Amino acid sequence: MTIENGIAKAIYVDGTKFVLNGRHVSYCFHVDDETGDLRTDHFGGRVTGAIPVDPSPVVDGWTGMPDRVRREFPDQGRGDFRIPALRIRQAEGHTVSALKYQSYTLLHGKPDLPGLPATFGTEKDVSTLVVHLRDEYSSVTADLIYSVFPEYNAIVRSVSITNNGFQPISIEALASFSTDLPYEDLEMISLRGDWAREAHRMRRKVEYGTQGFGSTTGFSSHLHNPFLALAHPSTTESQGEAWGFSLVYTGSFEVNVEKGSQGLTRAVLGFHPNQLSWPLSPGETLTSPECVAVYSNHGLGGMSRSLHRLFRDHLIKSKFATANRPVLLNSWEGLYFDIDETSMIRIAKESAALGVKLLVMDDGWFGKDYPRTSDAAGLGDWVPNPARFPNGLAPMVDQITSLKVANSSANLLFGIWVEPEMVNPDSALYREHPEWALHAGSYPRTEQRNQLVLNLALLEVQEFIINFMTDLLSSAKISYVKWDLNRGINETSAPKATHAYMLGMYKVFDTLTSRFPDVLWEGCAAGGGRFDPGILQYFPQIWTSDDSDAVERIFIQMGSSLAYPASAMGAHISAVPNHQTGRTTPLSLRAHVAMMGGSFGLELDPSQVSAEEKALIPELIALAEKVNPIVLTGDMWRLSLPEESNWPAVQFISQDQSQVVLFYFQLSPNVNHSMPRVRLQGLDEDAMYRVDGAGPYSGAMLMNLGLQYSFRTEYGSRVVFLEKQ
């Protein structure tokens, strides 16, 4: 076995056998000598030495039964009746393909994906193998692009399909990643939900046949996240094998898991085939989004930590990826649409007095001829409402940013809310350009929340958004943008329109975030409707959910952490009774849950907060700022889950292992009963730790015996600091 070009010692090639190695993972496949097909040999713990190759099966004298083998890139029409990774409608109308191995290329580092978000790294971080396939009958070629991040136990794959023939074809289905795992009992874990209850984990047995999920909303959606985990039934948070797959894409997607008749399990992630049908004329190429695949032999927690580190280090491009985030106050749940210059200056002064560092003006600030005083009008008219802001934004923003923050040498920062991808029919923009809204022929345009979707596949729409955002951000001292989206895509001119939209959207994001690198951008889609790796490429944080109830947020944020780092989560203290659930919870619980997010803030009107709670907020802000660096960059350990325990617990360990913060909660009262111990994980068993100043205690004691706390009421919470001696 030889190392080609010395590429990070991560990619080994021996003839037509390929081995991709991470620190604790190996991904192996080979070319079948008889068929030229790629066959998967292993995806799991690291292996050394010769990799045994399974021969083509022999069944009653028939050889090469393709539905009985592990295939690396299964096409359609040649006897593999399982889910294909590729389906091409050829010029003649059929969907048969015959892609065979041609050659390979090795690359230092990792190439960009044209027009798509993608992981990145230098040649010290990542190595790339490109496997070239060709269909000799249609002259269609496929490049399978594998990038290995050894320190993260991650394999990243995308696919490029090129029509080198003379007739047009159509790509009907294309998966970014597909893998066949050997026969064994497995379970699949996914994140399901809806508006205000995103990212609830669902774990179920992989049965014979096909099971899956996806989104046809045009976006990744509240309903299902583009993430999949596979694990053995015995796998826990800390023990056992787990495979994680995360699609770096914001559009409609499909994930399928199929256990075939022979017991092999195939996982396929990629475009949703109902919204593709991508035409390829001769010479044209379609490139899939990439999919990140990680392997862990330390349970689901190990899988999550690999994804978290990779996304923080090699996906999020923003300078704020691991930078401390300013504590913010957002006006939405405090004022809703009832904002003007007077109310914003008032709330700014009250925020600064509490120690808030950033004031965000949410919806309701724009619209001239069609004022944005409700959700019925104004979207698309991105100029300040002259009745509410008679002097424009700049004088008000100057006054706000001149305010000194209490207990700080800093001035208050200012941020603003926008929803650039949408338009109200009651707007000057729609009156001038109704053709800019997505539509399907003469069919009526379905409104949701009184709004339509602009067609970001159109160059003129892209330029409109880039230009007005450039003007807005240049008009005043704006340090933060909350970019929202509040409906899905219904009518489109063709199935391909949703991916064309994505390409236009990514172009807009890339242009604006490159043009304004000092702005902190936050993604939002009615909460977590676009909480996906594609958004994280450009926006380092996302509003996790419109549900700000502390108890619900424990489920939502811990569910989201299966795939996404806490650094990406926006979480706020809101007023009680909560506006979504009607529940009343203590301020301490609301604050402690919000501190588990990378972007901590408040979502209320300070003038409506009781004097008792207002007196506590500065202390809680100080605690949040102490916690924030560890939450942003530390390794996260889910010690107990809210679905399984009345006492959910989460732990973060700083990168240098010197600091630990524990979040511990009680959901229901515990009457006349002993309390469980919470056992920490990931500590140095031989080291000594101080726990909130007490001790020291050994790491072994803290992990094996644990800590015990009691709560007097339901909705109890505690934040505990440990320091390594």
From Swiss-Prot:
It catalyses: Hydrolysis of terminal, non-reducing alpha-D-galactose residues in alpha-D-galactosides, including galactose oligosaccharides, galactomannans and galactolipids. InterPro entries: Aldolase_TIM (IPR013785), Alpga-gal_N_sf (IPR038417), Alpha-glycosidase_related (IPR050985), Glyco_hydro_36 (IPR002252), Glyco_hydro_36_C (IPR031705), Glyco_hydro_36_N (IPR031704), Glyco_hydro_b (IPR013780), Glycoside_hydrolase_SF (IPR017853). It comes from Aspergillus terreus (strain NIH 2624 / FGSC A1156). Its cofactor is Mg(2+); NAD(+). Pfam families: Glyco_hydro_36C, Glyco_hydro_36N, Melibiase. It comes from the Eukaryota. Homotetramer. The active site is at D484 (nucleophile), D546 (proton donor). Disulfide bonds: none annotated. Its EC number is 3.2.1.22. GO terms for cellular component: extracellular region. Transmembrane segments: none annotated. SUPFAM superfamilies: (Trans)glycosidases. CDD domains: GH36. This is Probable alpha-galactosidase G. The keyword Iron-sulfur does not apply. Signal peptide: none annotated. Glycans are attached at N407, N490, N672. One of its GO terms (biological process) is polysaccharide catabolic process. Gene3D superfamilies: Aldolase class I (3.20.20.70), alpha-galactosidase from lactobacil brevis (2.70.98.60), Golgi alpha-mannosidase II (2.60.40.1180). Keywords: Carbohydrate metabolism, Glycoprotein, Glycosidase, Hydrolase, Magnesium, NAD, Polysaccharide degradation, Secreted.
